[in-house]
Swiss-Prot record:
Role, per record: Part of an ATP-driven transport system TM_0123/TM_0124/TM_0125 for a metal.
GO biological process: response to zinc ion; transmembrane transport
KW Cytoplasm (keyword) present: no
Matches recorded under Pfam families: ABC-3
Protein name: Probable metal transport system membrane protein TM_0125
Organism: Thermotoga maritima (strain ATCC 43589 / DSM 3109 / JCM 10099 / NBRC 100826 / MSB8)
């Protein structure tokens, strides 16, 4: 049984591969994977500055690992992966919030829950009998998992996220800077926190298919860090983050196509390497 991570070579090519742009026009499955990836990168770029400025990097990474349990549960019972994964992500966020109300810090709560959800995922995958075939794809991403339905759903989610960000832009900015002051000025901080948590959960669920559970944290953090270095306003932060995220996806996808490498890890490597020179401007 083939347990290696999938590369673009594993796609169902019907003829000889020519050039990236030629094949992008020629093969619908390649276009689907590419467009889906661009949408996912745009969504993660939109959320990333909020994650970075609110110092929610750990909860973003923890949510990605929690989603693994949801994917395993969906595989076991034959349910829709997106719905179960999203529900699991929200359950994780709720559990972290519940633990944090006691004397346990948020980071400690995440540290407790993250391995628990991962362990549950491994057990459920083992029970389902599909441990070897599905786990690598979910851990490191699998371009073959992206389909037209994913693209349509991601497009709708991205559009709604943009609309909500525009509508609640002032509330989000105040919430990011000082939650207590935002509450003092009458901003519904619980609603904003729920929206942000939902953004993170949805972004994680969509991003997992492209780069996997383990690597999702990179796309939730690196674009926001880049925007923090160069951005001067809320909109410039968001714009820079989205441009960086989509840019590294394009570069990673093109490199993976050229060298027959798994796209997810290549995208994250390029994102990290691209970020390093920018540190001198910080």
């Amino acid at each position: 049984m083939d347990q290696r991570n999938k590369t673009l070579r594993d796609l169902p090519w019907e003829g000889e591969r020519l050039s990236f742009f030629h094949d992008l026009v020629e093969y619908s499955f390649l276009r689907t994977a590419f467009v889906g990836g661009i949408l996912v990168a745009s969504l993660s770029g939109l959320v990333s500055p909020i994650v970075v400025f609110r110092r929610m990097e750990f909860i973003g990474d923890g949510t990605a690992h929690a989603v693994f349990a949801g994917l395993a549960a969906a595989t076991l019972i034959g349910a829709d992966h997106r719905l179960i994964a999203f529900a699991t992500a929200l359950l994780f966020a709720f559990a972290v919030s519940l633990f944090s109300r006691s004397r346990i810090s948020e980071s400690s709560a995440i540290g407790i829950l993250l391995p628990f959800f991962m362990a549950v995922g491994v057990v459920l995958f083992s029970v389902s009998g599909r441990y070897q075939t599905d786990v690598m794809g979910y851990l490191f991403g699998d371009v073959l998992l992206v389909n037209s339905t994913d693209v349509a759903i991601t497009a709708v989610v991205l559009a709604l996220s943009v609309i909500l960000t525009v509508v609640f832009r002032w509330d989000i900015k105040y919430f990011i800077v000082d939650e207590k002051m935002a509450r003092f000025y009458g901003i519904k901080t619980d609603l904003i926190r729920f929206l942000i948590t939902s953004f993170i959960a949805i972004t994680v669920v969509t991003t997992v298919k492209v780069v996997g559970v383990i690597l999702t944290g990179a796309l939730l953090i690196l674009p926001g860090l880049v925007s923090k270095i160069f951005g001067k306003s809320f909109w410039s932060l968001t714009t820079i983050s989205v441009i960086f995220s989509t840019g590294v996806f394009f570069a990673g996808f093109l490199t993976a196509y050229t060298l027959d490498l798994p796209p997810g890890p290549v995208i994250v490597i390029i994102a990290f390497v691209s970020f390093l020179p920018m540190l001198k401007f910080s």
